[in-house]
């Protein structure tokens, strides 16, 4: 028997949710299902899975309008005009108590078999002609037992063969070969495959692969030959053997018949089926008098096939609350608070009409409220609470007016804050001016207003310090001394004495003291003495002669005319041509030699305002100070004139005292030539 063909044009089966295989239609609704699926469904539910209508028969293998097969479901007459006897079980999944005992016979059959055995025994005893009665009795008993055993065996074999023939003739499920994975072709054939495997393992010593191949061969031959015992025996002879093939085939067909049979007793529709099994029922609203008992019985039912109860339907005009009587009002007043609350509850079938009323839609609270502080969450108006019938809405507080930006700035300004509680005032002012204003600002503004307009405490302290610095009175800057044009490089290092710079151009003589002219050794000595005056003043015991000489030399320099600068150079562009910057650079070099670290130097703004503490330097100030130090070092070390070897050595501690400044000045003023 070939496997049933698939019918994809019919769609999918609503039972197995797969493509319909071996299409079968249920009568009278004509819904299509798989033949195996609908038979399994009808085993316990004689109704259509889709419309719940009772199924009378199944139509399958339809070739044309005249060529098809019909399987009666509702206990219809069989081929011989009589009802088929009750079958064993369906699907082969419900008989866990073991195989059916086909050798068991009823009392009448047993009696008949016993009588037949007794007759045979008496005949045998009469034919033997034994003289002794004991021998006759033993012979009669043995003949009776043999006759009973033969009768039971013959009746059992006949019953098994009759069962196989009846299943082969009647409605049954198809026999299918195994799958490529060596599994049963259908779930109901699992018991057949298990029986075949057990029989082969008991007869042959095979491996798992050989057992799977032999089982596939047996199931393929069973699906091809069906219940044809002669053809199946011929197919099994090469595998089982000629002697054992008939018994194996008979047992195989009996097990297969039990698995594919469909018993009519399992398909009889229930007598007391609920109204839900009637399928689709159309409600007739016409005023016809042809209403039978069926309609009356249907109206008594509370539920239809769709689960809708029409007894609960109420007209829209009848949904108003019934007014309470005087007795009910009096009893409600006397029952107290608990009784009143219980009486105000609506009854089981009490309806409230909402016609003509607009119930405000409850707006869900925004998700951002979960991330806001408690103050703001409380300030946001809550959605309207549900009210009972006849009640009033809860009074809503008026919204707080939004403060103007100027008012918010005044409330959060640093003026009213004191030294110890600036952050607290900022938070309070931010909550007062910001959280009740609304939710139009962004997340950054909400965070700033949560901390106050002044920000976190670190930012508040910085702003407060800057405010104090800005409001502090700035002292008037000291007038810078006019730069005196000099032409001598001042070097205050210990090993380099004062030396003249590049040869200065000749200039017209001016009113200078002692008739000294610019460019002469005397003028150079005077300039050197004027430049060395600060260093001499810092010494421990300056001599009066040196002080007088330095003073007279400085006066002589201040009264002379300015020296013209070389061609192509501005007078103030070169730091060596300006007296004040050179002195400042020398002072910085001196401070560095004295051991004062650069980090402890105060910036110019702090030195101008010595009474205020500028606090820690910022990164920009540190970078600016470093740049200034590097520029000063470059001017002093790289841009200066290379030092020349000098005979005058710096005084060593503990050594001989070197020549003094007065001696040098006297030597230069005496007209001696300048020694390199």
From Swiss-Prot:
Enzyme class: transferase
Record's compositionally biased regions (Gly residues): 123-153, 422-439
PTM remark: Auto-ubiquitinated. Transactivation activity is possibly regulated through phosphorylation by casein kinase II.
UniProt key word Transferase: yes
GO cellular component: host cell nucleus; host cell PML body
Any one GO molecular function term: DNA binding
Family annotation (InterPro entries): Znf_RING, Znf_RING/FYVE/PHD, Znf_RING_CS
Compositionally biased region (Pro residues): 474-484
Gene3D superfamilies for this protein: Zinc/RING finger domain, C3HC4 (zinc finger)
GO biological process terms, semicolon-separated: protein monoubiquitination; protein polyubiquitination; symbiont-mediated disruption of host cell PML body; symbiont-mediated perturbation of host exit from mitosis; symbiont-mediated perturbation of host ubiquitin-like protein modification; symbiont-mediated suppression of host cytoplasmic pattern recognition receptor signaling pathway via inhibition of IRF3 activity; symbiont-mediated suppression of host cytoplasmic pattern recognition receptor signaling pathway via inhibition of IRF7 activity
Biased composition, class Basic and acidic residues, residue ranges: 440-450
Spans annotated as Disordered: 101-153, 266-517, 555-676
Annotated catalysed reactions: S-ubiquitinyl-[E2 ubiquitin-conjugating enzyme]-L-cysteine + [acceptor protein]-L-lysine = [E2 ubiquitin-conjugating enzyme]-L-cysteine + N(6)-ubiquitinyl-[acceptor protein]-L-lysine
Annotated EC: 2.3.2.27
Compositional bias segments (type: Low complexity): 304-314, 375-388, 397-411, 555-597
Family membership noted in the UniProt record: Belongs to the simplexviruses ICp0 family.
Domain notes: The strongly acidic region might serve as a transcriptional activation domain.
PANTHER family assigned: E3 UBIQUITIN-PROTEIN LIGASE TOPORS, TOP1 BINDING ARGININE_SERINE RICH PROTEIN, E3 UBIQUITIN LIGASE
Function recorded in the entry: Evades nuclear antiviral defenses triggered by dsDNA viruses. Acts during the initial stages of lytic infection and the reactivation of latent viral genome. Prevents the antiviral effect of nuclear bodies by degrading host PML and SP100.
Protein name per its UniProtKB record: E3 ubiquitin-protein ligase ICP0
Source species: Bovine herpesvirus 1.1 (strain Cooper) (BoHV-1)
């Amino acid at each position: 028997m070939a496997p049933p063909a698939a019918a994809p044009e019919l769609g999918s089966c609503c039972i197995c949710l797969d493509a319909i295989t071996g299409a079968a239609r249920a009568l009278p609704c004509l819904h299509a299902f798989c033949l195996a699926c609908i038979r399994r469904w009808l085993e316990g539910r004689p109704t259509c899975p889709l419309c719940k209508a009772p199924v009378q028969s199944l139509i399958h293998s339809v070739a044309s309008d005249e060529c098809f097969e019909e399987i009666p479901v509702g206990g219809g007459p069989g081929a011989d005009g009589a009802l088929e006897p009750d079958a064993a079980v369906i699907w082969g999944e419900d008989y866990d108590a073991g195989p059916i005992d086909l050798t068991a016979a009823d009392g009448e059959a047993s009696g008949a078999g016993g009588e037949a055995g007794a007759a045979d025994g008496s005949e045998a005893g009469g034919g033997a002609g034994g003289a002794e009665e004991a021998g006759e009795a033993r012979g009669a008993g043995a003949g009776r037992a043999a006759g009973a055993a033969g009768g039971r065996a013959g009746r059992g074999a006949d019953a098994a063969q009759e069962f196989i023939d009846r299943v082969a003739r009647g409605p049954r499920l198809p026999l299918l070969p195994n799958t490529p994975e060596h599994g049963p072709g259908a779930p109901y054939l699992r018991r057949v495959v298990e029986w075949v495997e057990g029989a082969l393992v008991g007869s042959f010593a095979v491996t798992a692969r050989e057992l799977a191949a032999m089982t596939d061969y047996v199931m393929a031959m069973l699906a091809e030959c069906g219940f044809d015992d002669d053809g199946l025996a011929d197919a099994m002879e090469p595998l089982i053997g000629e002697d054992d093939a008939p018994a194996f085939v008979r047992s195989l067909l009996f097990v297969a018949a039990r698995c594919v049979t469909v018993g009519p007793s399992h398909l009889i529709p229930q007598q007391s089926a609920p109204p839900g099994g009637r399928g689709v029922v159309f409600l007739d609203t016409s005023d016809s008098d042809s209403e039978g008992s069926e309609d009356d019985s249907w109206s008594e039912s509370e539920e239809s096939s769709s689960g809708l109860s029409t007894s609960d339907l109420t007209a829209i005009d009848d949904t108003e609350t019934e007014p309470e009587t005087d007795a009910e009002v009096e009893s409600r007043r006397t029952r107290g608070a608990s009784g009143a609350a219980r009486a105000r509850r609506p009854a089981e079938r009490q309806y409230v009409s909402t016609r003509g009323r607009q119930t405000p839609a409850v707006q869900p609270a925004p998700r951002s409220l979960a991330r806001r502080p408690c103050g703001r969450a409380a300030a946001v108006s809550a959605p309207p609470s549900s009210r009972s019938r006849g009640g009033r809405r809860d009074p809503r507080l008026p919204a707080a007016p939004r403060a103007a930006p100027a008012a918010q700035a005044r409330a959060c300004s640093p003026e009213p804050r004191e030294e110890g509680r600036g952050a607290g005032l900022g938070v309070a002012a931010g909550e007062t001016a910001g959280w009740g204003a609304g939710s139009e600002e962004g997340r950054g503004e909400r965070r700033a207003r949560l901390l106050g307009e002044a920000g976190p405490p670190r930012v508040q302290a910085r702003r407060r310090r800057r405010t104090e610095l800005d409001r502090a009175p700035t002292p008037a800057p000291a007038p810078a001394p006019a730069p005196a044009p000099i032409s001598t490089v001042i070097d205050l290092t210990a090993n380099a004495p004062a030396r003249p710079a590049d040869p200065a151009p000749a200039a017209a003589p001016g009113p200078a003291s002692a008739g000294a002219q610019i460019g002469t050794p005397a003028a150079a000595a005077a300039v050197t003495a004027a430049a060395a005056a600060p260093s001499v003043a810092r010494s421990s015991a300056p001599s009066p002669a040196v002080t007088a000489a330095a003073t007279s030399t400085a006066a002589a320099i201040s009264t002379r005319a300015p020296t013209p600068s070389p061609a192509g150079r501005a007078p103030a562009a070169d730091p060596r041509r300006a007296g004040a910057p050179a002195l400042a650079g020398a002072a910085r070099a001196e401070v560095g030699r004295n051991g004062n670290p650069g980090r402890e130097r105060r910036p110019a703004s702090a030195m101008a305002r010595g009474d205020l503490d500028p606090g820690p330097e910022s990164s920009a100030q540190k970078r600016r100070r470093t740049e200034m130090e590097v520029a000063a070092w470059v001017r002093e070390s790289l841009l200066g004139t290379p030092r020349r070897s000098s005979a005058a050595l710096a005084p060593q501690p503990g050594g001989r005292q070197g020549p003094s400044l007065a001696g040098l000045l006297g030597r230069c003023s005496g007209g001696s030539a300048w020694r390199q």
